[in-house]
């Protein structure tokens, strides 16, 4: 009989300094789904080269909201980089939405972007292109190899902290100063 780990959905996955993969180095991911088949998350501190205005324009969605148009779209991870993922705090029913945790949702349907463009979207929202994925047991292995820390998800980290500060702020929530850690680890 195998024992499944505690699901990590609605946890922040924080890269430790030893994680050298450039895609994930100093990254913070919101884990959106986690079960025996693997895990899926969205990086929440990696800016892409796109603004939301550019993405909306490519989708044929118009908006006059200049701050919305200037919002940076995140690079959510290397999986499905052409797909949009919206992390938000709006419990309304969207065409394709998942409750990640209490008050945090992931939506992948066009209707949320149309609502945002019309000024009727979520109060807080992050838009990302792409996501991160881990196969069965892969995330658990990486946690055992000291590649990541986990911390409870926090709306302040997701929606109110500057992108460049999210890595240290997320770790600080559990009392860890990442700048004081070495970039190697050992096992007893």
From Swiss-Prot:
Pfam families associated with the record: DUF179
Domain of life: Bacteria
GO cellular component annotations of the record: cytosol
InterPro entries linked to this entry: AlgH-like
Family: Belongs to the UPF0301 (AlgH) family.
Name listed for the protein in its UniProt record: UPF0301 protein XCV3063
């Amino acid at each position: 009989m195998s024992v499944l780990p505690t699901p990590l959905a609605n946890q922040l996955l924080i890269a430790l300094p030893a994680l050298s993969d450039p895609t994930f180095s100093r990254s913070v991911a919101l884990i959106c789904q986690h079960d025996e088949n693997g895990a899926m998350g969205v990086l929440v501190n990696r800016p892409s080269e796109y603004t939301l205005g550019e993405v909306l324009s490519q989708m044929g969605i118009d908006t006059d909201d200049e701050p919305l148009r200037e919002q940076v779209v995140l690079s959510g991870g290397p999986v499905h980089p052409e797909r949009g993922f919206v992390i938000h705090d709006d419990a309304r029913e969207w065409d394709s939405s998942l409750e990640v945790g209490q008050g945090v949702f992931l939506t992948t349907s066009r209707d949320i972007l149309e609502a945002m463009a019309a000024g009727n979207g979520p109060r807080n929202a992050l838009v990302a292109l792409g996501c991160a994925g881990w196969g069965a047991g892969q995330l658990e292995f990486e946690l055992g190899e000291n590649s990541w820390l986990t911390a409870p998800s926090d709306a302040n980290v997701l929606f109110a902290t500057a992108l460049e500060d999210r890595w240290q702020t997320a770790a600080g929530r559990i009392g860890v100063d990442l700048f004081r850690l070495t970039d190697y680890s050992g096992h007893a």
